[in-house]
Amino acid sequence: MAKSDVIEVEGKVTETLPNAMFRVELENGHEILAHVSGKIRMHYIRILPGDRVTVEMSPYDLSKGRITYRFK
């Protein structure tokens, strides 16, 4: 999958789940499951409920995504 096929949206973390998974509510009202990208995991960036994040989603499965950025 090429990088250009990725859909980037902003959302808010509503719930933390086991195995570094999060439930994220997107700006358009949809809720998805998202996991943490490797760079965020590598730099020990904590993600808590209420944080605003950027999520990358595949056009093939719009119910899952990857958290790529946490806003300050």
Curated annotation (Swiss-Prot):
This is Translation initiation factor IF-1. One of the essential components for the initiation of protein synthesis. Stabilizes the binding of IF-2 and IF-3 on the 30S subunit to which N-formylmethionyl-tRNA(fMet) subsequently binds. Helps modulate mRNA selection, yielding the 30S pre-initiation complex (PIC). Upon addition of the 50S ribosomal subunit IF-1, IF-2 and IF-3 are released leaving the mature 70S translation initiation complex. PANTHER family: TRANSLATION INITIATION FACTOR IF-1, CHLOROPLASTIC. GO terms for cellular component: cytosol. Residues 1-72 form the S1-like domain. The keyword Cytoplasm applies. Component of the 30S ribosomal translation pre-initiation complex which assembles on the 30S ribosome in the order IF-2 and IF-3, IF-1 and N-formylmethionyl-tRNA(fMet); mRNA recruitment can occur at any time during PIC assembly. Keywords: Cytoplasm, Initiation factor, Protein biosynthesis, RNA-binding, rRNA-binding. It comes from the Bacteria. Belongs to the IF-1 family. Signal peptide: none annotated.
